[in-house]
Amino acid sequence: MTTSAAATLQTARDIVRREGQGVADVADQLDESFVAAVELVGRVTGKVFVTGSGTSGAVARRMAHLLSVCGTPAVFLPGMDALHGTMGAVVSGDLLITISRGGESDELNDLSRRVQQRGVPVIALTASPTSTLGTLADLTAVVDAGPEVDPGGVIAMGSTLATAAWGDALAAVLMQIRGYGWEQVLFTHPAGAVGRIEQLPDALPSLAADGAERRPEA
């Protein structure tokens, strides 16, 4: 390799800046669909399942984890595993969040249709609202960081960070709506440095929303 250190660092910094801008742009894309998603997830009496394939699957796993940490019980559901029987775990009272940038992943669209047949609503997170997923979902939220945040507009890098940020906002807002406190967070997160925190952080501002389920104290 003969690339200079300066060129290497400049390229790396340009990538990070583009990705950072893509994430920042998500703030302006939050609209009525986000509010509707908060209300829909807040009314769920069962569990929230989150699915995706490839890099979207990695984001889905992270989103499910953070929803659970923040007081909204959620489970990552691998798309192909679901079509080999795991879908049986999804029942009436649950909800499915399907993540697909292009909205044309056959296994995710098949899964989404099948859970709808069981009376389970589907929220789609996609950059393409006119895609198959975008049109079949009960609620579609558009998360579009633009093609420039992904190399060649193909390799999902910045776009996955943008979708992750949308999920972070969902988890944090629901936490504040439910009044889910730090005591509850630490009860379910006893391991690692978080579990050894001696002084609780300041309480988050409370939000009010019609229909949101308040989860029981730990």
Pin down the residues of each PLM region.
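An N-terminal, well-structured beta->alpha segment
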Residues: 1-43
